[in-house]
Design a protein with these regions (language model features):
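Active-site catalytic motif of lipid deacylating hydrolases and related acyltransferases
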Residues: 1-56
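Short hydrophobic segments within beta-strands
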Residues: 4-8, 62, 137-139
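Active-site phosphate/pyrophosphate- and oxyanion-stabilizing loops and adjacent acidic/basic residues
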Residues: 18, 22, 72, 148-151
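Short active-site oxyanion
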Residues: 57-60, 133-135
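Gly/Ala-rich beta-loop-alpha elbow adjacent to hydrolase catalytic centers
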Residues: 62-71
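Aromatic pocket-lining residues of Rossmann-like dinucleotide-binding sites
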Residues: 74-78
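The alpha/beta-hydrolase serine catalytic core
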Residues: 80-187
């Protein structure tokens, strides 16, 4: 099983989620893919994702941006493998200025992001990681996040640092084989 966790204001309809799903379907493994709609509240997100992890023991995670932060929390809490795509590091700092009305990119759904949500994000921070669980993929051209924070945070993990690129990881398809190989490798 592979659980895809989308980023802030994104959705299961993201281009990367669709690519993973299509590849798994082409391999006859479509039933092994799940991409939940992550609630705006980090506490609710933790509940939803934690329950999903418990129902799918042995699953691997792919987390994009804020989804990478959640994937790190889940990977350490439930001893799961994870691929992190331009992951958010210290998102409670990055998103604090975003408090207020937000709109999801793919659905147009509006919600209010609050200071409580920022505090909930902080509560999910993982102090120590287990490097062997992770594959980090970052782009030096990420216009949203400083890739160096992730390189430092995930030191000791397998890393693919792509020169240039963008936050959405437009050339993600070029790395899908490495992503699936990491997810499918024995623990």
């Amino acid at each position: 099983m592979l659980i895809y966790i989308h980023g802030f204001n994104s959705s299961p309809a993201s281009a990367k989620a669709k690519l993973v799903k299509a590849r798994l379907e082409a391999l006859g493994r479509g039933a092994e893919f799940v991409a939940p709609a992550v609630p705006p509240s980090p506490a609710q997100a933790a509940d939803v994702l934690g329950a999903l992890a418990l129902r799918n023991r042995g699953a691997a995670l792919i987390g994009s941006s804020l989804g990478g932060y959640y994937a790190t929390w889940l990977a350490e809490k439930h001893a799961m493998k994870a691929v992190l795509l331009n992951p958010a590091v210290r998102p409670y700092e990055l998103l604090a200025p975003m408090v207020g009305l937000q709109k999801r990119f793919h659905t147009g759904e509006e919600y209010v992001f609050t200071t409580e949500h920022v505090a909930e994000l902080r509560s999910l921070e993982v102090e120590r990681i287990t490097p062997s669980r992770y594959l980090l993929i970052v782009t030096t051209g990420d216009e949203v996040l400083d890739y160096r924070w992730a390189v430092e945070r995930y030191r000791g993990c397998r890393q693919i640092v792509i020169e240039g690129g963008d936050h959405g990881l437009s050339d993600f398809g070029n790395y899908l084989d490495a992503v699936l190989a990491h997810c499918d490798a024995p623990r």
